[in-house]
């Protein structure tokens, strides 16, 4: 059987070549070297201002509206991680006193009420949506006088997307505010107009944290009421973290370059820069998560290469061999594979060897978990290959069951936990139990990916996606399938919100990973498949890694 695969490779086999665009970055990030003096300078300046910003935060606790405003500023500017314990304590106090506070302050404006609602919900505290009832008239419509309150409308719009099932007032608010903001945007100052348009394109709750922070710093800089100390602190910290990210990007770029898979497996996508953006968005921006970011980036690029092998190059016979070899997960199985697959197989085993060598004592079970998730991935990828080979169109739910694995969601979670020192078997068991936020983050990613990529995949020849499966099962045109999948996506996001606001037996860091997974899926696939057509991410890459802020 192995001999057949090798002989086939020497023949002119008809392969499903995708002809993916080449990397737009090459090895440009691999040569970066972090200068200790530069990072030390930024760190010193950040530490000098940190105490003053903390004083500002603590002083704001005298009044709830001022307190929530400062907390929101710290979050939007991307510096709240410096004060996590203080912010958590303050939010607990605000949440506990909120009913009486709102009852005693019926005059509160829409902006403030919506801000309290959003910030508390985004930090896992479920404020009831009836706080917005007072902004409706006797006919159940939103009052006309709020249509001229641009700041309040924007605040309500941002709050409306943190909704759960059964909250009709928030569903109505989303439509109402979006309609009015699209008209009002042209009537405000240019810098506020851009802020509104950014929000309409991507509400903060849906966005990539670091990119949202960069956009907000530019907006805040034009705010006449800005605090210069806070602005400078945010800029310095952004530049400091940017240097750290560039160093991490250089590390994974050199790792990928040394594997030399781009030359040996020219059919596959070289997207090491883009997958690091993914890792940064999913894992989080804090410096202490560097190991997880590096591992998620490495596993994402490796999984992408495996995916391209199954979807866009390998014959069904070769794919069966590769899947069988991976069940053994041993170098002894390498000789059963065609030559090109040997390079990939060896690279994966080497990655696992690295993680085992770097693992803390007594945590080898994390690497075992990652290996098992990789085996699951190859089985699921092969299943799609078998479907394609036999011209079988699975039922919609049958497809989604298998596709929940091919999203690579749990494999990348394993990589995240590998790098998270405090993670233990408790976190792995929680993920394997598949709580609602885990299931729906993967579902959200799969469906967005399919809608963005299915037409081009079908042209070159690929397994039916959720779109084709839905069309086939229900006998509907593509447009109707899109419409129904869009409804599923909306439901999925509400499920994510709902579960996010529940108490879980794992840390908030782990729960955050899954809401970030959904956010990054939205970031990559909302307009087009930005992994494949990476020019769509070029501006964002430059903003995040190449353009420091003037201080």
From Swiss-Prot:
Motif DDXXD motif: chain residues: 307-311
Binding site for Mg(2+) 1: 307, 311
Enzyme class at the top of the EC tree: lyase
Signal peptide segment: none
Residues involved in Mg(2+) 2 binding: 307, 311
InterPro entries, A to Z: Isoprenoid_synthase_dom_sf (IPR008949), Terpene_cyclase-like_1_C (IPR034741), Terpene_cyclase_plant_C1 (IPR044814), Terpene_synth_N (IPR001906), Terpene_synth_N_sf (IPR036965), Terpene_synthase-like (IPR050148), Terpene_synthase_metal-bd (IPR005630), Terpenoid_cyclase/PrenylTrfase (IPR008930)
Residue spans crossing the bilayer: none
Keywords per UniProt: Lyase, Magnesium, Metal-binding
Classification via Pfam families: Terpene_synth (PF01397), Terpene_synth_C (PF03936)
Top-level division of the source organism's lineage: Eukaryota
Enzyme Commission number(s) from the entry: 4.2.3.-
Cofactor note: Binds 3 Mg(2+) ions per subunit.
Binding-site list for Mg(2+) 3: 457
GO biological process: diterpenoid biosynthetic process; hydrocarbon biosynthetic process
PANTHER family: OS04G0344100 PROTEIN-RELATED, TERPENE SYNTHASE 6-RELATED
Note: Does not produce any detectable product when tested in vitro.
Role played: Probable sesquiterpene synthase.
Family: Belongs to the terpene synthase family.
Comment field on protein domains: The Asp-Asp-Xaa-Xaa-Asp/Glu (DDXXD/E) motif is important for the catalytic activity, presumably through binding to Mg(2+).
Protein name as annotated: Probable terpene synthase 8
